[in-house]
Amino acid sequence: ACLRGDFGRLDIRAGANVQDTCILHAYPGNETVVEEEGHIGHGAILHGCTVKRNALVGMNAVVNDNAVIGESAVVAALAFVKSDMIVPPRTLVAGIPARVLRLLTDEELAWKAEGTASYRELTRRSFATLRATTPLVAPERDRRRIELPELLPLSARKARLA
């Protein structure tokens, strides 16, 4: 992620995660805020906005100046949230420009919470186990893969439960 606190302030709170290739920035005198348990997906751009507690901004979405993403709301991947838009709590917004599609279900909110928790666990595990290594010259045969509780995209989870 590129966290540009050079002009405006960045405020990323406890339990929040900002994933690979995100950009956070703000104009001078403004700030970008990601509240507790906020989840910012890969490639998202936040510029001078506020992401409230437990909200999720999907991959490659853009949230522009003075927009507010409500508590436990979800911005779909690739959405464009215009300046000054107020996204209501517990809603799904999508599109270019983003518009409110519907309220989120309890199942969807539980899925989001599980995803955020998995990123917190990744941080703990990384601090505990990362060490300097020498790059491999060839793939290791039968290399062990990471073992995590089943964490699936929501669509795959729903299909499995159907």
Language-model-detected regions and their locations in the chain:
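N-terminal first-folded block
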Residues: A1-F7
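Glycine-rich hexapeptide-repeat left-handed beta-helix
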Residues: D6, D20-T21, A26-Y27, E31-V34, ...
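Surface-exposed loop/turn motifs in large extracellular/passenger domains
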Residues: R9-D11
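A cytosolic small-molecule/anion-sensing beta-strand core signal
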Residues: A14, E36
